[in-house]
Each structure stands twice: as C-alpha cells, then as structure tokens.
C-alpha cells in the first residue's frame, strides 16, 4: 500500500451523550459489558439473498474503491462477488457517525469504542449473529466479547482493526530510552516546548491511566471512570504538562511535520505516524508501549437496527474480515488487522510484527476509547464525570 489513511480528530468534538449504562470495563481482561440491558432488537437468524445495495458509514480508508489509488480497491470486487452496490458515507468523527446512524438511512457503520455503546443503548444497532459471518471464527480472540462491542456476552458487531496510542521520541535528543509516560508528564520540563500531545478531551484518559498506575491513593480503577477528585488530579497533571507542550496535534500530518522539523521530540502518537516519519528518513524516531500501558482504539462493524439491506451488510462484514481484504485495509489505514489469517496476506511481511497484530499480551495493556459517563463505566457507581465535563476541563487545560 502506498500511503495510509488515519483517523483525524476522531474524538475531538464534544459528544452529546445521554445513555444509561451498567457496569463495564475498558480492560481487555473483561468479557463484555454487563449491567443495564439495551433495547431488545432482533438479530438476523439466517442469510437471505442480497438486496442489491448497501449503504454504510465508514472511516476514510475503510471502504476503498480505487478512487484514491487505483491499486487499492476492495469495494468493486465485493460488488462483483455479491451483487451489492456499495454507497459509502465517510464519517469524520464518532459523534458524526452516531448522529448519521440515528437517521435510519444506513445499513451499518465502522464504529470506534467511543461510539459503540451509545449506538447499542440507543437501540440504533442490532445484535450480530456471528454464526452468519464465517470469518469471525478466526478473528483474534482478545477482540471478541469486549466491553466496547458486546453486552452480557452478546456481540453487537464484528471486530475490524485496532491500535494503541504509543509514546514516540527522537533518540538523538531524548536522553535514554523512556519506558514510562512520566517522560511526557512529570519529566516533560526537560524538553520544554518540544513535547506534543493528542488534541482531544479523551486525552485526559492518558493522564488518568498514568495516575492509575503511579498514584494508587487516588483509587482509579479505569481511566474512563473518574470521580470529581480523580478528574481534578488528571487535569492538574495535564496543566503541568501544558506548560511544556509546544503544540497539540489531531491531524497526523501535523505531528509528522513537527518531528521532522525538530519542533517536537517526544509525545503520544500512532504507529503509522512513526512509520511515515521513518519512511521519509529525515529524522530518526522510536516508539514504545510504556510500562503503564496505553489508551487506544478498536473498531467494529455494526448493523443498523433499521437496516434495509441486512443481508448485504452481513456479506460486507464477512468480506471485510477475510484474510486478503482485512490485510489490505490494515496496511492502507495503518492499524493491526483483527483477522489472524490476514498476517499471511500483507504485502509487507513484517507488518503484523510492527503492529503487534497477534500479540495478545500487548493488546491486554491497551485501554480502548470509551465515552465517559456519569454512571461509571467500570461499574463502581454513578458518581463519575461525564464527557461534557471532560470537554470543559480540556478547554481549561489548554487555556
């Protein structure tokens, strides 16, 4: 694949959230979300003939038809194989995707973890009958029945791809090889003006994760379930960091340019960004998953509860998670494929090693994006802070 598409400011806008959730955890060691039952929506019991059309909402790069690069096309082969004409609406943020799904005009969506539970509890998506998606059987087990894609053991989608928000640094400037997020929080003054961070309220979770591991007295159990006291501590840490941040980034090209120009030397990143910088060969960078773990994303293909073309949507979910196509998508987009067999199909033989695609131990250290709720998503009570509060705090942090 010639160039990656990556999400840009996927969570940078405020989310209008009014969902009552039961207990759940963002840790990959928890099996599914348990608690308040979502609205009853019937799942498809058996596949029928394709309806001839498919309307989906997707991140840029998830449904390529050759228009961006004529060699990158899995939409047309799908149409030829199934007879389902694909119409794609590009979603720019999770918030936008949620609103589009609520119109009932689409058959499915590639939802990130900060959107999935909202869609489930609003009754906008249907449970998925995984028996009707043959390729589901070889999806990485650590992505199945997770808090962001299932409720009480029932899958609400098919895992597509995932990635971590890792630490990147310039080894010729940064002294030693950092192993902790402390390098950009408590130790950031050493690189004053050259520290960078993700520009979104959800970045508060990164600070919360660091405090969860280093300040046990705060009793943080989940970086997305913060009481007022815990949120205050995370905000204080980020205000301290802000004094040393040269610039925040949401567009990946901005971070590439910052590292290549030398205006940034350390900060949070995506692996694909490090790969782009490495390919440009203007400056050397290294990445590490710090000892505290990291935040990250896991995307899921979900079926609308109002789908007019459910059979075509099921055909799409099976095709997009086939070994060949999932490999194509992963390399083009810049993320780990969900399909275990995809690793034998990548054009870059080292791709899955670079993205830790089959490394369950690595994946277990990722706390995937989840929208903060007043009712704590870790099941600890109803005294947590909602995302709207995070938005306000983020504005204060940046001044």
Language model: regions and residue ranges:
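C-terminal motif of bacterial Sec signal peptides marking the signal peptidase cleavage site
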Residues: 19-23
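Bacterial lipoprotein signal-peptidase II cleavage site
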Residues: 24-34
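Early extracytoplasmic/lumenal segment of secretory-pathway proteins
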Residues: 36-119
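Extracytoplasmic ligand-binding site segments that recognize negatively charged/polar headgroups
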Residues: 55-70, 105, 110-260
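Periplasmic-binding protein-like
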Residues: 137, 235-241, 271, 281-302
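A bilobed periplasmic-binding-protein/Venus flytrap-type ligand-binding module shared by bacterial periplasmic
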Residues: 168-173, 209-211, 297-309, 328-332
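Mature extracytoplasmic/periplasmic domains
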Residues: 303-368
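Conserved C-terminal helix/tail region of periplasmic/extracytoplasmic solute-binding proteins
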Residues: 364-399
């Amino acid at each position: 694949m010639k160039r990656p598409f990556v999400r840009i400011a996927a969570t940078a806008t405020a989310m209008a959230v009014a969902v009552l959730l039961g207990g759940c955890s963002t840790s990959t060691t928890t099996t599914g979300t348990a608690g308040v039952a979502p609205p009853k929506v019937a799942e498809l019991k058996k596949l029928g003939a394709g309806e001839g059309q498919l309307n989906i909402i997707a991140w840029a790069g998830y449904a390529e038809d050759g228009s961006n690069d004529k060699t990158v096309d899995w939409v047309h082969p799908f149409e030829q194989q199934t007879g389902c004409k694909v119409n794609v609406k590009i979603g720019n943020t999770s918030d936008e995707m949620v609103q589009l799904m609520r119109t009932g005009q689409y058959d499915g969506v590639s939802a990130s973890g900060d959107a999935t539970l909202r869609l489930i509890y609003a009754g906008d998506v249907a449970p998925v009958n995984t028996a009707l998606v043959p390729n589901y059987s070889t999806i990485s087990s650590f992505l199945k029945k997770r808090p962001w894609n299932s409720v009480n053991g029932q899958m609400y989608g098919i895992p597509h791809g995932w990635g971590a928000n890792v630490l990147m640094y310039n080894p010729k400037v940064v002294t030693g090889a950092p192993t902790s997020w402390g390098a950009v929080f408590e130790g950031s003054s050493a690189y004053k003006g050259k520290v960078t961070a993700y520009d979104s309220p959800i970045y508060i979770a990164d600070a919360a994760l660091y405090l969860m591991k280093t300040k046990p007295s705060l009793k943080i159990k989940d970086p997305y379930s913060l009481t007022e006291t815990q949120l205050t501590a995370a905000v204080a840490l980020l205000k301290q960091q802000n004094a040393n941040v040269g610039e925040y980034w949401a567009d990946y090209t901005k971070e590439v340019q910052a590292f290549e120009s030398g205006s940034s030397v350390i900060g949070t990143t995506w692996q694909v960004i490090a790969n782009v910088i490495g390919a440009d060969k203007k400056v050397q960078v290294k990445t590490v998953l710090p000892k505290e773990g990291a935040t990250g994303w896991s995307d899921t293909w979900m079926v609308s509860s109002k789908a007019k073309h459910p059979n075509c949507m099921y055909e799409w979910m099976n095709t997009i998670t086939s070994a060949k196509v999932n490999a194509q998508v992963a390399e083009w987009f810049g993320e780990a494929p969900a399909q275990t067999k995809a690793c034998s199909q990548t054009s870059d033989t080292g791709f899955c090693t670079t993205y830790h695609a089959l490394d369950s131990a690595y994946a277990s250290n990722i706390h995937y994006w989840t929208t903060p709720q007043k009712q704590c998503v870790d099941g600890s009570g109803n005294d947590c802070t909602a995302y709207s509060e995070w938005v306000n705090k983020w504005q204060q942090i940046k001044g």
